[in-house]
Curated annotation (Swiss-Prot):
Belongs to the UPF0342 family. It comes from Halalkalibacterium halodurans (strain ATCC BAA-125 / DSM 18197 / FERM 7344 / JCM 9153 / C-125). This is UPF0342 protein BH1149. Pfam families: Com_YlbF (PF06133). InterPro entries: Com_YlbF, YheA/YmcA-like_dom_sf.
């Protein structure tokens, strides 16, 4: 079984060395050094978290909260570094999703493909 864990460690290393990860890490460093970008991103992420928690608790999001979230999103999208960060997060998310799909393929033999 240790072979599976060895392969997981290799995959971790490959991910850390990927262009997607390096770009994301670089953008995080740049944002941390930019007080305005850092504050904008922190505020946006906190608002996202607050709204997600409300939804998980079954609380309806108000129209005002939805508008505020939309305005905050538009604001962070206008900031070049944050916009690039979000693009890189999406790219890395696609890679991780692809890896997850590949890793779980053997389970499809047992359980079938839920997407079919």
């Amino acid at each position: 079984m240790s072979n599976v864990y060895d392969k997981a460690q290799e995959l971790k290393q490959a991910l850390a060395e990927s262009e997607e990860f390096k770009a994301l890490k670089s953008l995080h460093t740049q944002i941390d050094q930019d007080d305005i970008a850092k504050r904008l991103l922190e505020n946006f992420r906190q608002l996202q978290l607050d709204l997600q928690q409300k939804q998980m608790q079954g609380v309806q999001i108000t129209e005002e909260e939805a508008q505020k979230a939309q305005q905050q999103f538009e604001l962070v999208q206008q900031h070049e570094l944050i916009s690039k960060l979000m693009e890189e997060e999406q790219r890395l998310s696609v890679v991780i999703g692809d890896l997850n799909r590949i890793i779980t393929e053997p389970l499809e033999e047992i359980y079938g493909n839920p997407n079919e």
